[in-house]
Amino acid sequence: TGVSLTTVAGTFTTGAGSAITNAASTDFYVSGGSGAVTYAGTIVNTAGRSVWVLNRTSGSVTFSGAITDTSPGQGIRLENNTGATLAFSGGLTLSTASNPAFTATGGGTVTVTGASNTATTTTGTAVTISNTTIGAAGLTFRSLSSNGAVNGILLNNTGATAGLTVTGTGSAGSGGTIQNSTGIGVSLTSARDVSLAYLNLTGNADDGLNAASVTNLTLNQMTLTNNGNGPTAEGIDPDNVRGAPTPTNVTVTAPAH
């Protein structure tokens, strides 16, 4: 492990010149503790997990340097951080194949900012945020892609503050492609302020996009093709979407229903 902090109450800070490359097991590991943790250096990972933060009940953990995680890397995992704040602002380049790329579950507040963040997988979910609040700065990715995951994107109970934005770069498909999911391609439940642009949803076994109890949903320049394999599956399936859903130049072709 490059850095391992377990039940640390004091402050831990490193400067921008720091670097961790392919540490055994986990590059940056934080378990418990309440002190502020700030890492401004880079992380390059091609084997274990790049970042793993768990069981924090308070305090902040901030990563302001670039993080690159490539297969067979195991991505970023944040779990059971009730009361803690976790922030990523230095740029994420995650390409983790069958492993989930970015996962936050079980509490706390998380933000991902910057214009160049990407997450690409095969059968791993690109982004999962479940029972965890997306903070005011939001969760921003330039592109999200998966091929054969259960879900490509999963948001569930992400709080009442902010949401996920996929920006693309202005050209078709530049926001990524969620394809061949065994379930719903993009699953949104009890989420808000979700904005998806230039994202393709193709060949997902259930709905291409399912939005249940979502407030403020914006879809822009999206193409949804051949989603669903049953009589109730849809290209887009909204259920109790609050605020005016805003679709702009969205094309839905050959849904199952």
Where are the model-predicted features located?
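Extracellular glycan-recognition regions
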Residues: S4
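Beta-strand-rich solenoid/repeat architectures in extracellular/passenger domains
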Residues: T1, G10-T26, S34-G48, R56-G73, ...
